[in-house]
Amino acid sequence: MKENKIIIGSHVEFKAPDYLFGAAKTSYNNKANAMMIYLGAPQNSKRVNVSKYKIEEYKRDFEKIIVPENIIVHAPYITNCANPDKFDFATDFLIEEIRRMSFFGAKYLVLHPGAFTTFSKEIAYEILEKALIKILDQTENVVIALETMSGKGTEIGTKINELTNLIEKIKSPRLALCLDTCHVWDAGYDIKNLEVFINHLEEIDALKYIKVIHLNDSKNDIFSKKDRHENIGKGFIGFETLQKIVFHEKFKNIPIILETPWVENIPIYDKEIKLLLGQ
């Protein structure tokens, strides 16, 4: 039987010269056992060859502490899989991104569901469905975790049941949910009433699909649709609720990733992880 444990880390930089090795070293120094990276700048499609990732150095020093399945890769923002005009670019790019992930064994790709422009939300979901099927058909192993969104602009994915319905329609074990605490709060879910929220997740059959958690406080009150992350305990969600999520039995063995703001141009993930763990 799998041991129940807390898996926690943060977004860390994946950059020259050390790439994967450097990201793992930063996470290790933060006392983390998970991490999230972008394989390039979130705003563009430029990627370095996987030969530069320093995979062997990562395996030598950190693989037993930050195991590959707890390395989360976030898809870049430029891939809008719900836009028919960007369909080929988005799907082809993500197929290659998943293949890059396979070189070091990362298990989860977090993906924003997308947004609609000159077309309807219903069409956006239809395009997203086709995109996911294409990507899944041409890749192996990696699980795509659709992120819950705040409702900013014309984003889709703000209603958790809509994402769950899409997953159940496609019927692939390689589809999951990434629950972002700031986003669901900003979208109108009162996660401060945590047990009520968890019961709702169970009622809509969503809880079983949550495989990644983004743990962020929010700069705005509930249902603001703003998507502005705040440091742990400094926002409207509050420390108590966020710590409850970390220790909750329903979320054990799920990688919990912090994406909170830097303070005076310095990341404070080490302090926030320590605070959340009560150390």
Curated annotation (Swiss-Prot):
Its recorded reaction(s) are: Endonucleolytic cleavage to 5'-phosphooligonucleotide end-products
Keyword check for DNA repair? yes
Which cofactors is this protein said to need? Zn(2+)
What is the top EC class of this enzyme, as a single word? hydrolase
Q: Name one GO molecular function term.
A: phosphoric diester hydrolase activity
Q: Which intervals of the chain form a coiled coil?
A: none
List of residues binding Zn(2+) 3: H183, D227, H229
User: GO terms for biological process?
Assistant: base-excision repair
Q: Which family does it belong to?
A: Belongs to the AP endonuclease 2 family.
Q: Which NCBIfam families does the entry link to? A: nfo, PRK01060.1-1
| HAMAP family on file | Nfo (MF_00152)
Put simply, this protein is called Probable endonuclease 4
Q: From which organism does this entry originate? A: Mycoplasma mobile (strain ATCC 43663 / 163K / NCTC 11711) (Mesomycoplasma mobile)
Q: What is the lineage of its organism?
A: Bacteria, Bacillati, Mycoplasmatota, Mycoplasmoidales, Metamycoplasmataceae
